[in-house]
């Protein structure tokens, strides 16, 4: 990965443009048209898009066939006739007793190898990690947000009631998933720990319903972060037990080691805090 691009290789406005593309604000053609002015020195807009896009194989930290883990594809009922929804379940191979569970909520393009890798990392820290693909039944993103929320709540309840789970569960999510973790915290009073990475914030009215302790991670160069202070005021007003960190010089997606927006130092610190938080709240 030493020869891969970093955020220093790209104009900040291009990074914001890519963020719009990832979140559905513009389509591929719109990105290419607007990115053309940054394509210099023989580099095309299409090449810039490729450089900014995930490289899953290069960033894998834990192999899918790691013999320390037990992995399986599972399905669980999607509520209100939304059909079956699948997911990726990972446990330590040598686990002998019940484990606390962690719901791993994907970004806005659905379950992918990076999120599966995140689940494996958590399992190596002796958690049962479940990464549902809750957008699959909705035809991808954007879809019906209410149905997506219902599917993630169903996934959390499915995980919590497994006979090999202690019944204590947390949730971690990234981007779209960070916003969904915030939503789950407003909807699930029994959620024992919530960790949103750069996720959209709930309203002050919804924040007042949060019972879960929260660990909140933001990137400095991210429009979502500008709404962080209002969210923090709502958390304080609701007497929520929370910690909030903004990582200097980082971009939206700084924890995702498959793209140039990855910041290894910030990601390491944020992940260390995350695992410590789950150990404290779920054990």
Feature-to-residue mapping (PLM):
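N-terminal secretory signal peptides
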Residues: 1-30
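N-terminal export signals
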Residues: 19, 28-54
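N-terminal cap/lid segment of alpha/beta-hydrolase-fold proteins
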Residues: 59-95
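Short beta-strand element of the alpha/beta-hydrolase
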Residues: 98-107
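Short amphipathic alpha-helix adjacent to the substrate-entry channel of hydrolases
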Residues: 113-132
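Alpha/beta-hydrolase active-site loop
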Residues: 114, 140-163
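Primarily recognizes the serine-hydrolase "nucleophile elbow" in alpha/beta-hydrolase
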Residues: 153-211
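Short beta-strand/loop motif that positions the catalytic acidic residue
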Residues: 216-218
């Amino acid at each position: 990965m030493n020869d891969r691009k970093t955020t220093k290789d790209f104009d900040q406005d291009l990074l914001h443009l890519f963020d719009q593309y990832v979140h559905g604000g513009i389509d591929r053609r719109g990105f290419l048209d607007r990115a053309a002015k940054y394509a210099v020195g023989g580099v095309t807009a299409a090449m810039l898009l490729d450089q900014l896009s995930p490289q899953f194989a290069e960033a894998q930290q834990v192999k899918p066939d790691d013999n320390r883990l037990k992995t399986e594809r599972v399905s669980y009922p999607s509520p209100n006739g939304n059909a079956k929804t699948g997911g990726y379940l990972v446990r330590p191979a040598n686990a002998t007793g019940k484990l606390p569970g962690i719901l791993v909520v994907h970004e806005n393009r659905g379950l992918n190898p990076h999120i599966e890798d995140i689940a494996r990392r958590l399992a190596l820290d002796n958690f049962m990690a479940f990464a549902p693909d809750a957008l699959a039944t909705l035809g991808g993103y954007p879809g019906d947000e209410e149905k997506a929320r219902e599917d993630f709540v169903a996934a959390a309840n499915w995980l919590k009631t497994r006979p090999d789970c202690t019944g204590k569960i947390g949730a971690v999510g990234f981007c779209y998933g960070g916003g969904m973790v915030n939503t789950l915290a407003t909807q699930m009073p029994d959620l024992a720990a919530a960790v949103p990475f750069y996720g959209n914030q709930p309203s002050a009215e919804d924040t007042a319903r949060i019972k879960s302790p929260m660990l909140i991670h933001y990137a400095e160069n991210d429009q979502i972060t500008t709404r962080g202070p209002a969210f923090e005021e709502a958390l304080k007003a609701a007497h929520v037990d929370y910690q909030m960190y903004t990582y200097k010089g980082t971009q939206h997606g700084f924890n995702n080691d498959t793209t140039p927006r990855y910041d290894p130092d910030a990601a390491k610190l944020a992940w260390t805090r995350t695992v410590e938080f789950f150990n404290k709240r779920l054990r």
